[in-house]
Amino acid sequence: NVVGIAADCGYSSPRAIIRKVLKDRHLPVALYPLVRLGAILFAHFDPDSVGADTALERCRIPVLLVHGDDDRFVPCDMSREMYRRCGSKDKELLIVPTAGHGASYLVDYDRYRKTVSDFVRRTLHPEG
């Protein structure tokens, strides 16, 4: 009985973040099929079979996405894209300027706390 989704610095899909990490490590993206095969064989998981971006298209519950615009690990554009594709009528995107990965609450604690608190209150107690 999930009533809402809140994600801080979420990536859009395993495939997208793996390819980004390969590039960041100066490894050829052509290695992706090998990484995928390793995930399938050893983790029993296919990175191409799932993604938050496509799952959110069918989402009908409240969604809060938070991201620092200076995140160098998970690009902020991934949250922007998930927000754009999200099918929920109750969706919110908080972008925190100058915040790195997982640091939005440190950079703008008051705004972060208010946004998350309001979301939780609204989601858990929709009648007011």
Predicted regions and their residues:
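Hydrolase active-site cap/lid region
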Residues: 1-46, 54, 61
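Hydrophobic/aromatic beta-strand patches that form the interior of the parallel beta-sheet core
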Residues: 6, 64-66, 94
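Short, well-ordered secondary-structure micro-motifs
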Residues: 17-18, 76-77, 106
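Short alpha-helix in the alpha/beta-hydrolase fold that links the catalytic acid
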Residues: 52, 61, 75-84
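Short beta-strand/loop motif that positions the catalytic acidic residue
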Residues: 58-60, 65-67, 71
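Acidic catalytic loop of the alpha/beta-hydrolase fold
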Residues: 69-74, 102-103
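Catalytic histidine neighborhood in serine/cysteine hydrolases
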Residues: 80-104, 109, 115
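Catalytic active-site module of serine/aspartate enzymes centered on a nucleophile-bearing elbow/loop
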Residues: 106-128
